Amino acid sequence: MRQRYLLAYDVADPKRLRRVFTAMKGFGDALQYSVFRCDLSEVEKLKLKGRLLEIIKEDEDRVMIVDLGPAGGRGE
């Protein structure tokens, strides 16, 4: 089952910021420059997390992933 996620990030370095934005375009839709809506399976979510961990520096950057519930649920 696919879940809808809201993902927001704050990346300190401009080069990493561009890399995160480019990576995110493959997983969801940009709502703002650093906020994405993603409909993901569990496997896709794990791939996304892995990709982000390859790019960000955990001591300098922040990523927040909020589970909004089933994709295509109420309010669609």
Where are these regions (language model features)?
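Basic nucleic-acid-binding interfaces
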Residues: 1-6, 12-76
